[in-house]
């Protein structure tokens, strides 16, 4: 299995507002960057979408070290999702899980890979995280045209 490092970040101007995601993918000496902007979304949706798009771009099963600055994403995918699924995508308070479309997509995107999820403090000088932040912010600021279909504002 190939070993890949993924770094992801999301940005939202206004929250909700225009948003974007950024991802940096490293395999051996190769580096690939992904980013995309959306008209109206939230920071959490962009954090999730960064992970989804990065994982979906892998063409074969890989061993992935995925680093995010979002505790929401890391805890959601490693801890909370198991009970959400058992409860039919409801929280402990029996409320519908927010961003369920993206949680399902993220769960499916990680399925064929062996993913180790890591958290890094945002804006702390971590080079790849800073680059992802820059990509995400620029995507949000650069007149985004994409519609976030699942966003329920």
Curated annotation (Swiss-Prot):
Keyword Magnesium: yes
Annotated Pfam families: RNase_H
Free-text cofactor note: Binds 1 Mg(2+) ion per subunit. May bind a second metal ion at a regulatory site, or after substrate binding.
Binding-site residues for Mg(2+) 2, renumbered to this chain: 9, 133
Enzyme Commission number(s) of this protein: 3.1.26.4
Alphabetized UniProt keyword annotations: Cytoplasm, Endonuclease, Hydrolase, Magnesium, Metal-binding, Nuclease
Record's GO cellular component terms: cytoplasm
Subcellular location: Cytoplasm
Subunit details: Monomer.
Official protein name in the record: Ribonuclease H
């Amino acid at each position: 299995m190939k070993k890949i490092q993924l770094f992801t970040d999301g940005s939202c101007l206004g929250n909700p507002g225009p948003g974007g995601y950024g991802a940096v993918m490293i395999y051996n000496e190769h580096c690939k960057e992904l980013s995309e902007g959306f008209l109206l979304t939230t920071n959490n949706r962009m954090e999730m979408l960064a992970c989804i798009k990065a994982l979906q771009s892998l063409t074969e099963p890989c061993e992935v070290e995925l680093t995010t600055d979002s505790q929401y994403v890391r805890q959601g995918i490693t801890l909370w999702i198991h009970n959400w699924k058992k409860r039919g995508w409801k929280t402990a308070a029996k409320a519908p899980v927010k961003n369920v479309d993206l949680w399902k997509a993220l769960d499916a995107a990680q399925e064929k890979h062996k993913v180790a999820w890591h958290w890094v403090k945002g804006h702390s000088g971590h080079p790849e995280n800073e680059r992802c932040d820059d990509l995400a912010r620029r995507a949000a600021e650069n007149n985004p045209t994409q519609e976030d279909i699942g966003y329920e504002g």
